[in-house]
């Protein structure tokens, strides 16, 4: 399970260092794609295969399904970790997430998210102010 929040910076080659605590679980080959809220999602291969299977089972005759699947898969890239735990983030994903240099890497259970520091700060401030309200709404989902 991926947990925690880490501050990192991209190097001049666009490489990011994956936190040591995440490396074993994410593996040396993993998938990055456009996430929700303008961040980047990273998935271990096994989790990616589960998501891929679920998305393939959706009815492609629905326009919203086609749009989501196109966006999600077209932005995806299979990435590798080098011996130092670094991986090059593709330019299209960096541009999508507004990442120049400084990033926040967070663990979100089954995936890792990479945020520009600025966007994470803004998101986090807004989420903190409504955290209790969100928690109350989750009761409806049985949580």
From Swiss-Prot:
GO CC terms, sorted: cytoplasm; nucleoid
Matches recorded under InterPro entries: MraZ, MraZ_C, MraZ_dom, MraZ_N, MraZ_sf, SpoVT-AbrB_dom, SpoVT-AbrB_sf
Top-level taxon of origin: Bacteria
Gene Ontology process terms (BP): negative regulation of DNA-templated transcription initiation
Listed Pfam families: MraZ
CDD domains registered for this protein in UniProt: MraZ_C, MraZ_N
Self-association and partners: Forms oligomers.
Name of the protein in question: Transcriptional regulator MraZ
Species the sequence originates in: Syntrophomonas wolfei subsp. wolfei (strain DSM 2245B / Goettingen)
Gene designation per UniProt: mraZ
């Amino acid at each position: 399970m991926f947990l925690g929040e880490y501050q990192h910076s991209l190097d001049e080659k666009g490489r990011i260092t994956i936190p040591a605590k995440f490396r074993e679980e994410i593996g040396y080959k993993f998938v990055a794609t456009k996430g929700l809220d303008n961040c980047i999602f990273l998935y271990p291969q096994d989790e990616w295969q589960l998501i891929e299977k679920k998305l393939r089972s959706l009815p492609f005759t629905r326009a919203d399904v086609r749009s989501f699947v196109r966006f999600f898969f077209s932005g995806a890239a299979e990435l590798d970790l080098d011996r130092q735990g670094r991986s090059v983030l593709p330019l299209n994903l960096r541009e999508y997430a507004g990442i120049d240099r400084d990033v926040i890497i967070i663990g979100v259970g089954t995936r890792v998210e990479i945020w520009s520091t600025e966007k994470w700060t803004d998101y986090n401030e807004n989420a903190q102010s409504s955290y209790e309200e969100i928690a109350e709404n989750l009761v409806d989902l049985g949580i």
